[in-house]
A protein has these predicted regions:
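Residues in the helix-turn-helix
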Residues: 32, 43, 57, 71
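A short, Lys/Arg-rich alpha-helix, primarily the initiator
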Residues: 1-29
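The alpha-helix within a helix-turn-helix
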Residues: 23, 34, 48, 62
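Short, basic-rich loop-to-helix N-cap that marks the start of a DNA-contacting helix
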Residues: 50-63
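Residue-level detection of the helix-turn-helix DNA-binding "recognition helix"
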Residues: 24, 38, 49, 77
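Short C-terminal boundary/hinge segments that cap the last helix of small helical domains
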Residues: 66-81
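Recognition helix of helix-turn-helix/homeodomain-like DNA-binding domains
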Residues: 39-53
Length: 85
């Protein structure tokens, strides 16, 4: 009999509140970021919902904004994801 394994439930996730703060501090609109980084509006919308995006998207944003990954995202407990920084 084949046994199926259940994945362990995640306790943390990434959020992008640091990105939104960085954009505000620099006076950059999301549409401008989209053009600067050549990232789709759908990817930016996913980030707004704390959903997964590809590492390519993250690298493009870091290059466009001349910043590090830590400047735009952080790992937080799932229960606190919406309110972190």
């Amino acid at each position: 009999m084949k046994q199926t394994s259940k994945k362990k439930e995640l306790k943390t996730q990434f959020n992008y509140n640091r990105l939104w703060k960085l954009l505000i501090d620099r006076g950059i609109q999301k549409q401008e970021l989209q053009k600067m980084s050549e990232v789709s509006a759908a990817s930016i919308a996913k980030m707004g919902r704390c959903e997964n995006v590809t590492t390519d998207v993250l690298l493009r944003m870091c290059e466009a904004l001349d910043c590090t990954i830590e400047d735009i995202m952080q790992r937080v407990p799932i229960k606190d994801a919406a309110k972190a920084e």
